[in-house]
Curated annotation (Swiss-Prot):
Function: Catalyzes the NADPH-dependent reduction of glutamyl-tRNA(Glu) to glutamate 1-semialdehyde (GSA).
SUPFAM superfamilies reported in the protein's UniProt record: Glutamyl tRNA-reductase catalytic, N-terminal domain (SSF69742), Glutamyl tRNA-reductase dimerization domain (SSF69075), NAD(P)-binding Rossmann-fold domains (SSF51735)
Designated name of the protein: Glutamyl-tRNA reductase
UniProt-annotated binding residues for substrate: 52-55, 115, 120-122, 126
Amino acid sequence: MQLLAIGINHTTAPVSLRERVAFPLEQIKPALGALRTHLSGRNGTEAAILSTCNRTEIYCATDVLKPGEEGFEHTLRWLAQHHNVPASELAPHLYALPQSEAVRHAFRVASGLDSMVLGETQILGQLKDAVRTAGEAGALGTYLNQLFQRTFAVAKEVRGQTEIGAHSVSMAAAAVRLAQRIFESVSTQRVLFIGAGEMIELCATHFAAQTPRQIVVANRTVERGEKLAEQLSEQGLTTQAIRLQDLGDRLHEFDIVVSCTASSLPIIGLGAVERAVKRRKHRPIMMVDLAVPRDVEPEVARLDDVFLYTVDDLGAVVREGNALRQAAVAQAEAIIDSRVLNFMHWLETRSVVPVIRELQSQGEAIRQAEVERARRMLARGDDPAAVLEALSGALTRKFLHGPTHALNHTQGEDREALLRLVPGLFRHSSHSER
């Protein structure tokens, strides 16, 4: 069975490319079906898709593809075709990790070692969601199930035995730091949050600690926006929830805009921001776009009075705290190295299961045939002792026929290998079953 992890992330591709190969949640299940059919021509391949702001990754287990370039090329072609992105444009940014490298990568991702925010925990929840979705789509089997269960166990071990999450600067905290560099005080600013998901909740919590002048939440579902606004108002803040369609009329009111929705298209265009800046009499506005695909048209960054930051821009701020956790990284890598070896041992033992089953099947067929022959001998009145002798002799001859034939007809290095191997296979053990 071949394992393969293929994908792009924040270290290999800019957000402008990552957003083009992101999978909306509602598209993942049908995409898994299409991927498995593409790779094997049938639904024999196991697969899972992890798609976040910082990465799009495909994990596969298949016995159809050959290891190496074939698996990479097949998966690359499917990913490029699915998203209508030229394969030649995508390929330089992709990593393809086979076997133990794929296992190590999964362990590192879940443990937060491959994240923009070193040691962050959000990725573990996102990976669990991806595995749950793959399971619901019927795309998981023995190998990926085992891989991901061990992945979650390793992540728990790493976080429990190291300080990988200590001194962590989250994306939300990084957004606040950037705001503090632009504005003398966040407490005098009006802040708009677009969306009401987990990332927006985290950002809102961090900004709320700076007691801004006002916090407004814009969301497609106004009830969800109201819920977040009410939570923030309990901290003594002035809050409000508005409908997303009212954004154009209100955008000019805000000094800081933080957006993270699941929209596949930008929801804030260049024209809307130009009008907002004009109504603000060119007072600066800071915009933080944490969405992938992006919520704000990239052209907005060209405006003189707008400070637009994407998830990649926040990465530099996040990395400032990463150096403080290098000792924890070394400890985490040591744990992962050990657990990768354990998993690969399990994988290797799985490869002999079909051989063992075939041996057992052949042995059982021989046994049944000889027992039936012995019964016929007993039925016609043959001496039981002679029947037992005949039975045991026939079993011995037939069980040893294969090894004996191989020893007599194999030459060279293969014969030498058999001469070393066969005695051990038939050596009597005091612990063997009786």
